[in-house]
A protein has these predicted regions:
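Core catalytic lobe of class I
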Residues: 1-200
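S-adenosyl-L-methionine
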Residues: 203-230
Length: 230
């Protein structure tokens, strides 16, 4: 299936070519990022080390390393290693002497995180997030991507690091989950994706965001939202 395709494409990278690729897109992300903005980067043990090192080489500051714990992780069918049950998320800013990036600290303490098994109400948010990887039916209605992220985690990240009306760029948008979350949250969005089939899925999802929002029980836009297809 698609996951096998993803792994095949990963195997086609040499370490040198992956480092070159990573430097290329990170440099551009750093160039266009406003001093008041920040970026979130998902990764696994396959690539997060290279991304971390490249951020340091480019002068990109890593604000936090977040561990997304998945208690419902996919089982290890081969039985040859431990079951992977987390992803790493790097939260980064442009770098430099001034730290101007936006952070909604009050939301991080007092927002509604009832879906997170570790977040204590009214307490500072920590760097381990216990959030199910299950997707709602409305998230899969128009198709799916092998590394598709649940809307609930994306909305959290968007709210923590941006204001309503801000512009969000997703350079590897897949089936458009980040764009959908951004639109729900009232942000402007730009999404980039090479695969035409995923672009079509993203376009369909974005066209039905009102239905998605209603199914999530979010009929008002007071907490989070923006990202795009083409």
């Amino acid at each position: 299936g698609d996951w096998n395709k993803v792994m095949q494409e990963w195997d086609d990278f040499t370490l040198e070519s992956y480092m070159t690729f990573t430097k290329s897109w990170l440099s551009e992300a750093q160039r266009i990022l406003k001093p008041t903005g920040s970026m979130w980067i998902f990764g696994t043990y396959h690539n997060i080390g290279v991304i971390n090192v490249m951020c340091q080489m480019l002068g990109i500051e890593i604000i936090n390393e977040v561990i997304w714990y998945k208690k419902n992780a996919f089982p290890n069918l081969a039985g040859r290693r431990l079951t992977a049950s987390h992803e790493t998320i790097l939260w980064c800013n442009k770098g430099g002497k001034k730290r101007e990036y936006y952070f909604d600290y009050e939301y991080s303490k007092s927002g509604d995180f009832s879906y997170d098994g570790l977040k204590a109400p009214g307490k500072q948010m920590r760097t381990v997030w216990d959030i199910s990887n299950n997707k709602e039916k409305c998230e899969l209605e128009y198709g799916k991507h092998p590394t598709q992220k649940p809307i609930r985690i994306l909305k959290r990240m968007i709210k923590l690091a941006s204001r309503e009306g801000d512009i969000m760029l997703t350079p590897f948008s897949g089936s458009g989950s980040e764009c959908v979350a951004a639109k729900i949250m009232g942000r402007k969005y730009i999404g980039i994706e090479l695969d035409n089939s995923y672009c079509e899925i993203a376009i369909n999802r974005l066209a039905h965001v009102d239905e998605t929002e209603e199914q999530f029980g979010q009929l008002h836009l007071e907490l989070f939202e923006s990202a795009v297809a083409k």
